[in-house]
A protein has these predicted regions:
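Histidine-acidic metal/acid-base catalytic patches
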Residues: 1-7, 14-28, 101, 156-175, ...
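Mobile, glycine- and charge-enriched loop segments
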Residues: 2-10, 59, 64
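N-terminal-biased segments
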Residues: 6-18, 44-54, 85-90
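Active-site beta-loop-alpha junctions enriched in small/polar residues
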Residues: 9-13, 35-39, 70-73, 110-112, ...
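Active-site acidic/histidine proton-transfer and metal-coordination neighborhood
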Residues: 16-22, 59-60, 64, 76-173, ...
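Conserved beta-strand positions in the central sheet of alpha/beta enzyme cores
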Residues: 33, 67-69, 106, 144, ...
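Glycine-rich, proline-tolerant flexible connector loops at the mouths of alpha/beta enzymes
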Residues: 33-55, 59, 110-116, 211
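A short acidic, helix-capping loop that chelates divalent metal ions and anchors anionic groups
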Residues: 38-43, 74-79, 113-118, 182-183, ...
Length: 290
């Protein structure tokens, strides 16, 4: 399909970067979203480490990087030390992105205190995001806000608020079907409201009954119909990025505030490579019908 590229969070295949690249190439994929490699998160790499270690392996495999799967913004809103650390990490991540010829960095809008009204923290969220955006503007990189669970921008109304208020060419939306399902939202309404800001799509599905992730197209994310709308009717071009969450993987615990086993209660495939391949083929089957 012209101008549609399938990428994915390859650390769901294996913690080994070589195994990630091997599986990706066997599937015929040419891109990954770089979240972690060899059990090390992308935000913990130096520019030199990426240049001398990861980049040569990417080039040898013929694999490009669609986005940096960073943890930026995945700290508590009142964690000032954590925020300052992430500002420094974002500077490095922007330099890494340029080295990898990658213009997108995935990020979040801060964890809210449990039991508190997110509206009480809106001003603090906006202020801190403006600082992140200023760094991105300096490096000409685009920050993509993912509608992650339990952050300020986890529901539609607050996602729209962020996009409209910040109104920056360097702050856009990475649309995640499953997260909206798990937050009780209608993905079709979310798509329509956020469409002017969406530059990237995560392929992850879920059901609302137990909030479990399921193979794409089999849950309540309305992935087939919304991808058809996006690509065929609206002319979306760019990346569709696999994030299966069908098998427990090493880096998951570092991404979540709860026990990883509460996120993926049971492995739906025998290993990460099999689950990743299943998600890839399910997406290809959806696209083949367009």
């Amino acid at each position: 399909m012209k101008d549609i590229y399938i990428s994915g969070f390859a650390d769901e295949i294996s913690s080994s970067f070589d195994e990630q690249l091997k599986t990706v190439r066997e599937l015929g994929m040419q891109y990954i979203s770089l979240r972690s490699a060899d059990k090390k998160g992308i935000a913990d790499f130096t520019v030199e480490e990426v240049k001398t270690d990861l980049l040569p392996r990417l080039q040898a495999a013929g694999v490009g990087v669609s986005s940096s799967g960073s943890p930026i913004g995945k700290v508590k809103i009142d964690d000032e030390e954590g925020f300052e650390k992430q500002c420094a990490q974002l500077e490095t991540l922007c330099e890494i992105a340029k080295l990898l010829d990658c213009k997108y960095i995935r990020m979040f809008s801060f964890f809210m205190p449990e039991g508190k009204d997110p509206a009480d923290y809106r001003d603090a969220v906006i202020e801190k995001l403006r600082k992140f955006i200023a760094i991105a503007e300096k490096h000409d990189v685009i920050l993509m806000h993912e509608n992650e669970k339990d952050i300020y921008g986890d529901v539609l109304s607050r996602c729209v608020d962020l996009m409209q208020t910040l109104n920056s060419a360097h702050f856009k939306s990475a649309f995640d079907f499953a997260n909206f399902v798990q937050c009780g939202e209608d993905t079709a309404k979310c798509w329509d409201a956020l469409r002017p800001y969406i530059v990237y799509i995560h392929i992850k599905d879920a059901v609302s009954t137990d909030k479990e992730n399921v193979l794409c197209g089999t849950g309540e994310g309305k992935i087939p119909e919304l991808l058809h709308k996006a690509i065929v009717e609206e002319g979306y071009t760019g990346f569709l990025t696999l994030e299966p969450h069908l098998v427990l993987f090493d880096s998951l615990q570092s991404l979540e505030t709860t026990d990883a086993k509460n996120i993926i209660r049971e492995n739906k495939y025998k290993n990460g490579a099999e689950g990743y391949a299943a998600q890839y083929h399910a997406l290809c089957d959806i696209l083949a019908k367009f």
